[in-house]
Amino acid sequence: MKKTFISKQAKEFRTKYDIANSRVQGIRSYQKSLIVEEFKEFIEAEGHLFRESDKLHEEALKELADLVYVCYQYAENMGWFLDEALCRVHESNMSKLREDCKPIYREDGKVLKGPNYKPPYLQDLV
């Protein structure tokens, strides 16, 4: 099965920043906390505009796909070019390395912005 650019970018980021894939509860909880963190940030910004089993993994995948799907639907409704925005955000995320090309981590493992960080330019997409 061919991977989409989003999948390739996610793998590239995790590889570059040495973030291992794991089904361990603690790792899953951490990843979920990042999704919640980003979701809360989206809700805040938008407000300014006015068990370990295959079945459980399947359900989690479905919910994650639903989240991505509704994000694409929101972007389409707003006339935003989400694919291009994702490419630019990915480039920005890949610029977080220190001068020695090593990542900077927060205590909980989140990759932080280094001195080479360049925020994505998205103004032309809105």
Outline where the language-model segments fall:
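Flexible "arm" and connector segments at domain edges
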Residues: 1-64, 68-126
